[in-house]
Amino acid sequence: MLNIGCHLSSSKGYKAMGKDAISINANTFQFFTRNPRGSKAKAMDLKDVEGLLQLMEENKFAKILAHAPYTLNPCSADERTREFAMEVLVDDLARMEYLPNNFYNFHPGNHLKQGVEVGIEYIVNSLNDVLKPDQTTTVLLETMSGKGTEIGKNFEELKQIIDGIKLSNKVGVCLDTCHVYDAGYDIVQDLDGVIQEFDRIIGLDKLYAIHLNDSKNPFASHKDRHAKIGEGYIGEEGIVRIINHPKLRHLPFFLETPNDLEGHGEEIKMLREAYRDESIL
């Protein structure tokens, strides 16, 4: 079964997101834990959360993915920005325990000309401070496009972060197809080679989720602009190869394409039709 969903608005609550997912034939979804450009998070409505959990169980949902706000930058040169990142991480991971055994994804951050090594050290220290042995949430580092001073533009940087984390069993990777293509990993012409490189450097056992996006910009552009499936440089054929790849097909896929709910439903319909049943592979 193809486990696929899209990014959904949390403005109407948790159960409403589950209902929206079901309405477009999705069996998972992604959401922001708080305003993506701000710091405030809504109070948890436990009845609403319980409603979502029940709906997920009844409809056999895959794990869902919470996304940290874009303002989170644990490797900033500014101490207050790093402190804010810590506060958000602590709060978000505590809130995620009301939605146990799911994923929490964040952008590693921008080192802002301090250098990659300094930035990675800050990220490692932050995660070592916030991760707990008894947490049920797996924290995912997102692959980045290499825009500006982003950390996570190559597999080696993500590996270095993971290697520095004491509770590394609580951490994994979310691969963004647009980001890796823009970063210079040719998933169109050499998908097998990219997967082998990921496995060699990080290990496929650390790959937990995929952001499924086409790219508005050409290969190795370091731009990070998502396109609708089939309307970018990766193309529909390239995306279909990804969801059917034997090393990836079991993972949950999350669309972040510039679409409304109906548009995401159309993409999901197309991808479900293109997904080959394992029994005929």
Curated annotation (Swiss-Prot):
Disulfide bonds: none
The protein, known as: Probable endonuclease 4
Organism taxonomic ancestry: Bacteria, Bacillati, Bacillota, Clostridia, Peptostreptococcales
Single GO BP term: base-excision repair
Comment on bound cofactor: Binds 3 Zn(2+) ions.
Family membership: Belongs to the AP endonuclease 2 family.
Highest taxon listed in the record's lineage: Bacteria
InterPro entries named among the record's database cross-references: AP_endonuc_2, AP_endonuc_F2_Zn_BS, Xyl_isomerase-like_sf, Xyl_isomerase-like_TIM-brl
Binding site for Zn(2+) 1: 67, 107, 142
PANTHER family: APURINIC-APYRIMIDINIC ENDONUCLEASE, ENDONUCLEASE IV ENDODEOXYRIBONUCLEASE IV
Enzyme nomenclature, EC number: 3.1.21.2
Species name: Alkaliphilus oremlandii (strain OhILAs)
Catalyzed reactions: Endonucleolytic cleavage to 5'-phosphooligonucleotide end-products
Leading EC class: hydrolase
Positions contributing to Zn(2+) 2 binding: 142, 176, 211, 256
GO molecular function: deoxyribonuclease IV (phage-T4-induced) activity; DNA binding; DNA-(apurinic or apyrimidinic site) endonuclease activity; phosphoric diester hydrolase activity; zinc ion binding
Positions of Zn(2+) 3 binding: 179, 224, 226
